[in-house]
Amino acid sequence: MTDESMSYQEKAYALLQADAEKIIQLIRVQMDHLTMPQCPLYEEVLDTQMFGLSREIDFAVRLGLIEAKEGKALLDRLERELSALHEAVTKKRVR
């Protein structure tokens, strides 16, 4: 799909997905290395990224570019990835 044929709604959602994917990559890097998620620097970066994405989503919803349920689905996916990281780290510590 070319830029000309994409609607503003499609562009907005694609940009939000790309930003969410960057956060997921950050989470996956942590999972791959099983670095402690309680690391203050990691927590601050992740919190900042999640907050920024939530504000982007809110803005897109308020403009009518995406549905609130689509934004919630993006954030829910990130929460699941984060839960998986915490579970993996917890399992590693138990061993």
Curated annotation (Swiss-Prot):
So which domain of life are we looking at? Answer: Bacteria
Similarity section: Belongs to the UPF0358 family.
Coiled-coil spans in chain? none
Q: Pfam families, per this entry? A: DUF1507 (PF07408)
Organism from which the protein derives = Geobacillus thermodenitrificans (strain NG80-2)
* Protein name, per record: UPF0358 protein GTNG_0942
